[in-house]
Amino acid sequence: DAEHKSEIVHRFNDLKEEKFKGAALITFAQFLHKKPEEEA
């Protein structure tokens, strides 16, 4: 039972990491799009 719980936690952490990467990528993309407008 403890091993099964650990597996769920491990998968949840992987999912959280993937969502964090996705959010960071979107934020970075928006930053790149906004920067030229501010310079112009």
From Swiss-Prot:
Q: What is its main location?
A: secreted
Name the residues that bind Cu cation.
H4
| Gene3D superfamilies, A to Z | 1.10.246.10
UniProt subcellular location: Secreted
Top-level taxon of origin = Eukaryota
Q: In which tissues is it expressed?
A: Plasma.
Keywords of the record: Copper, Lipid-binding, Metal-binding, Secreted
Ranges in a coiled coil? none
Q: Where is the Albumin domain?
A: 1-40
The record's annotation in InterPro entries points to: Serum_albumin_N
Function comment: Serum albumin, the main protein of plasma, has a good binding capacity for water, Ca(2+), Na(+), K(+), fatty acids, hormones, bilirubin and drugs. Its main function is the regulation of the colloidal osmotic pressure of blood.
Q: What else is known?
A: In the red-eared slider turtle, there are two forms of albumin, ALB-1 and ALB-2.
**What name does UniProt use for this protein?**
67 kDa serum albumin
